[in-house]
Amino acid sequence: MVELNRRTFLSGSVAAGAVALFGTEAAHAAGAVKLPAKWDETADVVIVGSGFAGLAAAIEAKKAGASVVVLEKMATVGGNSIINGGILTATGCPQQKKHGIKDSPELLAHDMLVAGLYLNNPEKVKLVADNALSNYEWTVNELGVEYNPDAIGQEGGHSVPRYVFTKNGSGSGIVSKEVEKLEKLGVKVRTRTYVKHVLRDDTGRVLGLEVLEGYRFPKTGTGKTKFIRAKKAVILCYGGFSRDVEYRTMQDPKLTAALDSTNQPGATSELWRETSRIGCAQVQNDWIQCTPWNNPKEKGMGIGWTFAQSGAAEYGLWVATDGKRFVNELANRKVRADAIMVLKGEGKSAVAICTKPNLKAFEEARPGMLQKLLEQQIIKEYNEP
């Protein structure tokens, strides 16, 4: 993780002080929200969202000496982070060295730029790539996260194997450790707290938030109004909007209600709309990630992706229902997802195939998962005559 001093911390905040705007006059014209006569609470830093990013920001802010408030609209912490696959890119990690894999931050940055069609912000790409190892080390040394010590995997779009994954195979292996660390520092995430408005002064400077405490998702307007002042920064880590069909189809019309989402139910657009109202510079909202490895028989993320990606994509084949291979299984996820969309338009489906001998690495990395997938009939086993 990048070492943040107070100045860097504040200058890097999404909505700290003079927020990144398309122009404060234009944002102001979009409709001002009246400031409260009195603030109910004041903190140095107020963080919205309790996924990986929000919790990490809270930990570092607290360690830097700030008073911290963390808000989460759902009843439980973690957002999408807690239900993801627990995978982390860790260029230069011990697992890579154990397997003799040559890698570098420069190669990671190159892969990111290629996968992003060079639409990425090069400075941010470099920041991520240069700190991939320190990020991994922070989760291990600071939080005590446990990763599989022997396994290293190769995601689509990456030139070499460079991802590690938590021992429990879930993002909860990271989130739970972040929550533990935060509580040791004296900060508890405030769940069921809905952010209604970002509050600013006449110059456009962010002063704090209007929230609803005791909010009951998805019941609009539930909860008690409270005003929280942020003396130094409001940090927005509220995640995506893929569960909001109306909003996502405004961005990408092909992503209709016919398509399910792997996101948790609270991945909706309220704060995307609110930050747009105040003029925050939102970039590439219509570049919505579609995952190519999920099983349509499962709801949400499920577990079928483990076979499709960590099994068949790395050690087998993806074919269409006509038996023809249709894509490079280790292409980036957009290339693969787009190829599946084409198949869908042709009335075909994608099938992930792998021979059992080739699944040895998968079984070693995720003990018991293959049997679980078979028992739940998420995958099928065929024996040659």
Annotate each predicted stretch with a short phrase:
Residues 54:
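N-terminal Rossmann-fold NAD(P) dinucleotide-binding loop
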Residues 272-274, 281-385:
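An anion/pyrophosphate-binding glycine-rich loop and adjacent beta-alpha core
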Residues 130-225, 231, 245-247, 295-296:
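Conserved redox-cofactor binding core of oxidoreductases
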Residues 216-223, 229-299:
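Glycine-rich loop(s) and the adjacent beta-strand/alpha-helix scaffold that form part
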Residues 90-128:
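Glycine-rich active-site loop/strand segments that organize a redox cofactor
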Residues 39-51:
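Beta1/beta-strand and adjacent pyrophosphate-binding region of the FAD-binding site
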Residues 64-81:
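Glycine-rich FAD pyrophosphate-binding loop
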Residues 1-16:
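N-terminal secretory signal peptides and thylakoid transit peptides that target proteins
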